[in-house]
Amino acid sequence: MKTRKLLFNLLTMLVFASLLAACGGAATTEAPPAGAPEEGEMAELIAAAQAEGMLTTIALPHDWCNYGEMIETFKSKYGLQVNELNPDAGSGDELEAIRANRNNTGPQAPDVIDVGFSFGTTAKDEGLIQPYKVSTWDSIPDEAKDPDGYWYGDYYGVLAFVVNTTVQPDEPQDGADLLDPKYNGQVALSGDPRTSNQAIQSVYAASLANGGSLDNAQPGLDFFAELNRSGNLVPLIANNGLVATGEIPVRITWDYNGLSAIDTFEGNPTAEVVIPSTGRFAGVYVQAISAYAPHPNAAKLWMEFLYSDEGQLIWMEGYCHPIREEDLRARGVIPDELLAKLPDVSGAVFPSLAQLNAANELITKNWDSVVGADVQASP
């Protein structure tokens, strides 16, 4: 399948990264990006976006994939305001925000979304997003984009545990460890599995370490049911603040979120990111423009910025693997220090789009009946 080719390519990148690190890093000679925009066309887009004056985003926490720097750089570079909606929203919430604001051009209507891989096709099928091909389109792998430009991959990471070792010095090394009584009242997901892509995929990943497979996510639901019955699962949406205070000592999240959290903590509290020893699970996110975007030119400019070399490297600074990584490596534009920051996630598996869709449906429809934990945002 096409998606499986993407997965092979992405895993190949990881191997290539380790080889580069061992050999002293990539070359530093810069080459122009593929499909660089024509100066006049880009100037027209910038002018049109500045006339709109604003971009409305949703579900972009500043500590997620370095979005804080991404947003501030965009604002400074182009002089636009950025209206940030619900930074802790899940992918399902993002689509619902578009549905609810079809006829609203006010501040609650998002221009752009960043959602889990399977949510891109859902959004297209429902007519919630519009096509736009960025100028670096050709350097995005074919398997990671809708051929008509409705959505395209932006970055990927691997699910991990971020552990406040000041509160819990005994770090879990694998999913099964989370059932140990020592973690009573200490483990939380980073979203609601009924709506959040990250939480859904965390449940999906648990199936791999508990007798399931990419074609069978049921053991993941069963595992979380046991975790809930044991009292170890806390029904709160974990974030870095809750990890820092010790209210949630063990957060299940993408590796890039955990690594950026540790940078933020600056040693207080001490913390570690653990890539599970089995069931390593990787996930791709995708970008798209709302079909009802109040600021369509600002949305297009945002996409151009994200998929420029500058934007891709900002994501990488936040420990994410940008989707144009292969092109960036080939042209030698990635600084050695960025390559050295990325963790070893060898052995991670990428589900196909069909597998993701099946797991998504199973988990969202059966979480309440099987697990019974009403996961909510922290008061």
Question: What are these regions, as identified by a protein language model?
Answer:
Residues 56-72, 83-99, 106-247, 261:
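Extracytoplasmic ligand-binding site segments that recognize negatively charged/polar headgroups
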Residues 47-48, 75-83:
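Signal peptide-proximal N-terminal region
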Residues 1-52, 375-379:
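Short, low-complexity disordered leader/linker segments with a strong preference
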Residues 239-252, 258, 269-273:
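Conserved active-site beta-strand-loop modules that form the wall/rim of enzyme catalytic pockets
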Residues 241, 347-379:
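Conserved C-terminal helix/tail region of periplasmic/extracytoplasmic solute-binding proteins
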Residues 54-57, 110-111, 188, 308-320:
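Bilobed periplasmic-binding protein-like "clamshell/Venus-flytrap" ligand-binding domains
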